[in-house]
Amino acid sequence: MDKKQRKVVIVGDGSVGSSFAFSLVQNCALDELVIVDLVKTHAEGDVKDLEDVAAFTNATNIHTGEYADARDADIVVITAGVPRKPGESRLDLINRNTKILESIVKPVVASGFNGCFVISSNPVDILTSMTQRLSGFPRHRVIGTGTSLDTARLRVALAQKLNVATTAVDAAVLGEHGDSSIVNFDEIMINAQPLKTVTTVDDQFKAEIEQAVRGKGGQIISQKGATFYGVAVSLMQICRAILNDENAELIVSAALSGQYGINDLYLGSPAIINRNGLQKVIEAELSDDERARMQHFAAKMLTMMNVAS
């Protein structure tokens, strides 16, 4: 990314892709934003809608395009994918979305793209790992949203439980984006004070908070059909950190190289993000039990990936 032009390509203009585009145009100075989707009419409508947003914010060339448009992009964001069907196994979902991913990643790489991939398609940790495998890119140039959304939900749950502002909560969810995620209770701070000095952190408290975090997505889906605003902002923050060379500490699906005793897989962890992508993984302190749980899921994840690939 030595050039001055700032260009992002979004693949997938569904609810997440569209919401992300809106957040990106609001919050990042771009020269060019390209939307790639099979349903071109919808993408063209989004372009027209986003042009009006750009008139209030930043001068941006927004248009629909093809995978070939990625050749000079800084970032390709992949939000495309299919949701899990009733009764469908996790492996079946992985197989379906891996095929979709392959149909995207190969032509993007063939275009000459030399930037960073950012992934939000689910299951995000596995599909981020698969993107790196399919692309052959260095691990630091492939990043997923990981447990960033889980972390946001944790902050909201704690803020509501303790009657404080979300900005007063410093907390993280690690590992898998999903039911195997790990709430790092020992490291939570409320107004710069350890959580255990603010309230009683017993098994009941932990269970209530974990349920609030893991159950929120299902609640939203049952009420409005899908979740998309939170992950859209997560994507925006990652892209902004890359475009602005922020060296920002974010929770992402990061390539692990020995951290937490795990190698060659992507899982949720704090990391430093800058113009080169993932600059550094910050290994959070975990108890022996939490570390074992994370390693157990990593082993399952590797098995599923090897079967699917």
UniProtKB/Swiss-Prot annotation:
Mind telling me which GO cellular component terms the entry cites?
Answer: cytoplasm
The alphabetical list of record keywords is: Cytoplasm, NAD, Oxidoreductase
Which coarse location class applies to the principal site listed for this UniProt protein?
cytoplasm
The Enzyme Commission number assigned here is 1.1.1.27
Catalyzed chemical reaction(s): (S)-lactate + NAD(+) = pyruvate + NADH + H(+)
Q: Which SUPFAM superfamilies match?
A: LDH C-terminal domain-like, NAD(P)-binding Rossmann-fold domains
Q: Where in the cell is it found?
A: Cytoplasm
One term of GO molecular function? L-lactate dehydrogenase activity
Q: Which residues are involved in binding substrate?
A: 90, 122-125, 150-153, 227
EC category: oxidoreductase
Q: Where does NAD(+) bind?
A: 16, 37, 67, 81-82, 103, 145
Q: Which residues act catalytically here?
A: 177 (proton acceptor)
What the record says about family reads: Belongs to the LDH/MDH superfamily. LDH family.
- Role this protein plays: Catalyzes the conversion of lactate to pyruvate.
The annotated subunit structure for this chain is: Homotetramer.
Q: What is this protein called?
A: L-lactate dehydrogenase 2
**What species does this protein belong to?**
Lactiplantibacillus plantarum (strain ATCC BAA-793 / NCIMB 8826 / WCFS1) (Lactobacillus plantarum)
